[in-house]
Regions:
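Flexible "arm" and connector segments at domain edges
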Residues: 1-113
Length: 113
């Protein structure tokens, strides 16, 4: 079972709406999902500032969890989306088969992207 599916079980168990088709939830749920992700990003920022690896791991895990929850709230299958992003990212190689990086270390799009 994927993490995305585990979050679905949590949401169903706790009476949270899980959409079966892609559509906007209520404004209240939309704002809640945004707020949860924002809160976890702020916690990550604080953990990084304090160089607390345990809190960094906690924040990153919570970011995944609330993001998966947002996917279910909007009816977006994030397992499928992730697979597409992975395929796309793996196509970011130069013609020599090596990654292309910009000056900050970000992987850039290759000619076959």
């Amino acid at each position: 079972m994927s993490n995305f599916q585990s979050v679905k079980i949590f949401m169903q168990t706790f009476g949270q709406e899980v959409k079966n088709k892609t559509e906007f939830p209520s404004e209240k749920i939309t704002q809640l999902r945004y707020k949860l992700i924002k809160e976890e990003l702020e916690e990550l920022n604080e953990a990084i500032k304090s160089k607390d690896m345990k809190e960094i791991a906690d924040a990153l895990s919570d970011i995944l969890y609330v993001t998966y929850g947002a996917g279910h709230a909007f009816g977006i299958d994030l397992d499928k989306c992730f697979d597409e992003v992975q395929k796309s990212n793996m196509s970011k190689l130069g013609s020599d088969g090596k990654p292309i990086y910009n000056e900050s270390g970000k992987v850039m799009k290759g000619p076959s992207y």
